[in-house]
Amino acid sequence: MTDQVLLPTSADEAISQYGNGDGVTIVAGGTIVLPEIAAGRLVPTQALMLHRAGLDGVRSDGGRTVIGAMTPVQALTDHAVEILAQTARHIADAEVRRSATVGGNLCAPAAADAQRGDLGAPLIALGARVRSTGAGGERVEPVEDFLAGDRTGRLVLEIELDDVERRTSGDGLRRRHAHSYAIAAVVGAVRSDTGELRLAAAGVAPTAVRLRTVEQTRNAEDVLRDVRPVDDAVASAAYRSAILPKLVREALDRLERT
């Protein structure tokens, strides 16, 4: 049984109650955490319930789009950035998307039978940044650095991305009968103002990964230098290793044509 339930009614209160994260379990949409608590596999000392903390919503702010961590995934399905909307539409079903949150999806740990966190790939490709708080204070960092680092003791507050024109491409494979978990997905974006290419993959490892080597070489086979695919109930590492270069090549080709 949870010893204490915390119900902040503002972002400032949530930050204060979370502190450095010691002994605090974050409950956002609850699609992952609540079943674990109900099954007795997770027994939080403190449960921080964020549904009243005012951390939801999408807004424009000085040339940036800011997405609150508690924004439902469903709210992104008609987002102006099509690659983000496209990815959101393929996450689970509408009922789950109405509860699942952007911050929760980004931070979702890999399950025993599948990889999670589909939104990480388009957010990396779009150059998005995460604002979080917790141990060490508040910080803003690129999504790829946040995912690659130690997220223990971090509370995600919002995600921000620059409002610039981009050419984008995204594709992936998934099994509809496997709760829509991706076998592999690749997303790419090229900024119109600078020509910068960014590529990311999701569904193949415990978190989404930026494909830095491929960005430099434009060689799809180099993707396996950037990511080591894993085995799970959805697909084998060998199968992912075989299809990933094909998905990268398709993304590069589409970006060159547009």
Feature-to-residue mapping (PLM):
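C-terminal structural segment of proteins
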Residues: M1-T258
